[in-house]
A protein has these predicted regions:
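Membrane-proximal interfacial segments on either side of biological membranes
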Residues: 1-236, 241, 245-258
Length: 258
């Protein structure tokens, strides 16, 4: 099916598709897709996707409120599953989780059957705080290697409920992905835990009741937290937790969160 132009409009929001072809309910080809949407009367998306030798996505605004989940998303209904191409992304402003702002986000990469297999990107949180994301694909061993560094931690930890209440810190996340299984290491430096029920639960499991009370009150400072984790479909297992701070050292293993 070939459609020269298809427009959807609701109030100020609009979606315009040009030169689009469908095959088996999926997009097989397109020229341009223009997206402009509003949330609570404020513009939250304004960008254009162009498809030529490579797919280019450029815009002034992009809503990535579910950034962490988006990076790990596995969707059998991916509309771009027919595409294997180089990709270039350039957004002036991105809204990430917890209403943080990421500016001047640029990405070069490649998708295979609609999924990223290669990424090199950088964004600016302001005040000399940056986000770097890289992904490499090992075709021989059928593995992907994902690495994320961020000077701002909270927007990237929203997928993990036990990090609620974490303040400050710098984050380094590395993961080896093979099919539906990922083995990852998360390292956070120089942060504080304040009113964090999930972290309090972990401290209680380690028989550190007094420090758990402190984490609920004035807060608990850490120099380093390292977590080795394994995720298989919806099951998350924390294989090892090492936390070091001025008044605490914790080593745990085997905590499971589904």
């Amino acid at each position: 099916i070939l459609i020269k132009e298809l427009s959807f409009k609701e109030g100020k929001s609009s979606l315009i598709l040009e030169g689009i072809k469908f095959s088996k309910e999926k997009i097989s080809s397109f020229k341009n897709i223009s997206v402009r949407t509003f949330n609570n009367k404020r513009e939250n998306n304004d960008f254009i996707i162009s498809n030529h030798k490579k797919i280019v996505i450029r815009g002034t605004q992009f809503d990535a409120s579910n950034l962490a989940k988006f990076l790990k998303k596995k969707d059998s209904k991916n509309l771009l599953s027919n595409f294997t191409k180089d990709v270039e992304i350039d957004f002036a402003n991105i809204t990430v989780p917890l209403s943080e702002k990421l500016n001047n986000f640029k990405l070069i990469g490649k998708i295979s059957k609609g999924k990223f297999i290669k990424i090199s990107s950088k964004g600016d949180f302001g005040e000399n705080n940056f986000l770097d994301i890289s992904m490499k694909n090992d075709q021989k061993n059928n593995k992907q290697y994902l690495e994320i560094y961020s000077d701002v931690t909270k927007p990237l930890l929203t997928e993990y409920s036990f990090f609620k209440g974490l303040v400050g810190g710098k984050l380094l996340f590395s993961s080896v992905i093979e099919g539906n299984v990922s083995n990852s290491k998360l390292k956070i430096e120089e942060f504080k835990v304040v009113n964090a029920p999930g972290m309090v639960k972990l401290l209680s499991l380690a028989d550190l009741g007094g420090l758990a009370d402190l984490a609920e009150g004035e807060g608990l400072s850490f120099d380093t937290l390292e977590i080795k984790m394994e995720k298989n479909n919806s099951e998350l297992k924390l294989n090892e937790i090492i936390a070091i701070g001025p008044s605490i050292s914790v080593l745990m293993d085997g905590y499971q969160n589904q």
